[in-house]
Amino acid sequence: MSKGRLFTSESVTEGHPDKICDAISDSVLDALLEQDPKSRVAVETLVTTGQVHVAGEVTTTAYADIPKIVRDRILDIGYDSSTKGFDGASCGVNVAIGAQSPDIAQGVDTAHETRVEGKADPLDLQGAGDQGLMFGYAIGDTPELMPLPIALAHRLARRLTEVRKNGVLDYLRPDGKTQVTIQYDGTTPVRLDTVVLSTQHADGIDLEGTLTPDIREKVVNTVLADLGHETLDTSDYRLLVNPTGKFVLGGPMGDAGLTGRKIIVDTYGGWARHGGGAFSGKDPSKVDRSAAYAMRWVAKNVVAAGLAERVEVQVAYAIGKAAPVGLFVETFGSETVDPAKIEKAIGEVFDLRPAAIVRDLDLLRPIYAPTAAYGHFGRTDIELPWEQTNKVDDLKSAI
């Protein structure tokens, strides 16, 4: 980036219609994994005015009361009254769940390496659940090694929900979005340019007299005070609150929502590339999810080891095969050692076969519902296995 370039990322709150769907899908997944860790799950959710539709494919020995899971999660998010446009206690819930395709199952249960090539390694038994490409990224912008724009957007979204739920701003409603524009000098963030914050609110709240000053003081300035970034000037940012002038009608009444429609919010805010696969509602046999988590784990450890200031890693799979068909490492000229050595070290330190990823990150657990909002990467409020920097010494030794 040349001097003076502006980069923008956005986040949304847990009450955004698409995020309601992600939360429901991952809550169903967790309920099944808790009883049967080997559950195969692909659950999609749609919400609209007064209705929730849950569909997909599941193979499991577990039982989940899906309508109850749906209602409990919606109520927890904060949609508990028709005055808010949606009520988890009274909305309609329709469930249409079938079994996983046996054609897919045979490739996952018995990989090409075992079925055709005759390999005996247990980690060659499980094939990838689909073809596809997944990216991981890390950068030294923040202590959690995430790009600053998305990290700040998530903090603002979490704070917006916090002041609603703890009663500090009790007139707020669950639906909301945040957007952060930061000025860069090269790759260094130097100035916070613009914050856009749209939040659903009770009727009759004055935008200029109440909402905007409350959001500036209780949300934005509180988050910025805790940010403590060394190079970022936050003294003269522009704040735009509800630029349409009013946001009373929100949630599923304002917009229909679908699982998997916030994949850039879920990852790196557009700063890094994305393979296209969504996460929520998918068990770890789906490499869309598990391999994207593994790539973040790889990238974070590379940066934490001091091998590069920023790195993007791509992996690719063929459905039904265990071994990746490709690995690509990009350090953007920020490396401290030969990138070819970094790529070789990654191959030696990390086993990227699906069964190995599941084993090393302990993914057959009900840990997914908390990831459904505020990002899957760089989380500081919950512990996630792919955020560990436990391979730093191994990478240094391999180099």
From Swiss-Prot:
Cross-link (Isoglutamyl lysine isopeptide (Lys-Gln) (interchain with Q-Cter in protein Pup)): K341
Reactions accelerated catalytically: L-methionine + ATP + H2O = S-adenosyl-L-methionine + phosphate + diphosphate
Binding site for ATP: H16, D175, G176, K177, K246, F247, D255, R261, K262, A278, K282
Gene Ontology biological-process annotations: one-carbon metabolic process; S-adenosylmethionine biosynthetic process
Record-listed K(+) binding positions: E44
Ribosomal protein in keyword set: no
HAMAP family: S_AdoMet_synth1
Protein name: S-adenosylmethionine synthase
Record organism: Mycolicibacterium smegmatis (strain ATCC 700084 / mc(2)155)
